[in-house]
């Protein structure tokens, strides 16, 4: 019969045998490498207050010019679907205001996607994000220079998403931008989206404005 050990075995580790614990290093924010965008952008917020002038209801939230700053902004702002009725988000190239009267916009127009109330919960946020990614990623290829910005309008009667372009007279470029937008958002082929020139829209109710182009 084997003789049992009279004392329990102890695993002795000398101090110099202890495993090293690597401290987690927090990167210096100034040393983080950011990925620049081709253009600088500004995000705007509009809240309809009828007691104030329209322009006074529009303000810049912030500007950004890197991929990381865009995601930091997007992840810390309220989703479009959660905005109150009468509110807008706009993202435009730096130096361009989200209004028809701006010199960069007045000759242009917008591709317009209308969404009903049920689509606010199912499609609006995805459509808005995909539009922004096309915007800041220069996703319209050689026609990206024609892009001014994008807006999302939250309304009781139905929401609107608009992609604003610089020159409504550039028919070929405008149509290709619309086709690319529709593809990027995976809009079903049977659903038609239209382009309206700002000169046709100014001073008219939305339902009376005719589309210049459709895709």
UniProtKB/Swiss-Prot annotation:
- Domain of life assignment: Eukaryota
Give the start-end ranges of region Disordered: 1-27
Which terms under GO biological process does the entry name?
A: regulation of translation
PANTHER family, alphabetically? EUKARYOTIC TRANSLATION INITIATION FACTOR 4E RELATED, EUKARYOTIC TRANSLATION INITIATION FACTOR 4E1-RELATED
Tell me how this protein assembles: eIF4F is a multi-subunit complex, the composition of which varies with external and internal environmental conditions. It is composed of at least eIF4A, eIF4E and eIF4G. eIF4E is also known to interact with other partners.
Functionally, this protein is described as follows: Recognizes and binds the 7-methylguanosine-containing mRNA cap during an early step in the initiation of protein synthesis and facilitates ribosome binding by inducing the unwinding of the mRNAs secondary structures.
Record-given protein name: Eukaryotic translation initiation factor 4E
Species of provenance: Aplysia californica
């Amino acid at each position: 019969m084997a003789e049992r050990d009279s004392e329990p075995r102890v695993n002795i580790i000398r101090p110099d045998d202890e495993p090293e614990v690597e401290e987690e290093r927090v990167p210096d924010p100034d040393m983080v490498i950011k990925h620049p965008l081709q253009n600088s952008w500004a995000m705007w917020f509009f809240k309809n207050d009828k007691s104030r002038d329209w322009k006074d209801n529009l303000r810049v939230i912030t500007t950004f010019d890197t991929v990381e700053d865009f995601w930091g902004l997007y992840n810390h702002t309220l989703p479009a679907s959660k905005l109150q009725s009468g509110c807008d988000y706009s993202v435009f190239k730096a130096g361009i205001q989200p209004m028809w009267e701006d010199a960069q916009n007045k000759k242009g127009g917008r591709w317009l996607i209308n969404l009903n109330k049920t689509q606010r919960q199912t499609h609006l946020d995805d459509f808005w994000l995909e539009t922004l990614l096309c915007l800041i990623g220069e996703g319209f290829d050689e026609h990206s220079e024609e892009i001014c910005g994008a807006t999302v309008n939250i309304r009781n009667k139905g929401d609107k998403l608009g992609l604003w372009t610089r020159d409504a007279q550039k028919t070929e470029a405008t149509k290709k931008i619309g086709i690319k937008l529709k593809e990027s958002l995976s809009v079903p082929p049977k659903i038609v989206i239209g382009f309206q020139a700002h000169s046709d829209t100014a001073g008219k109710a939305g339902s009376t404005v005719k589309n210049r182009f459709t895709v």
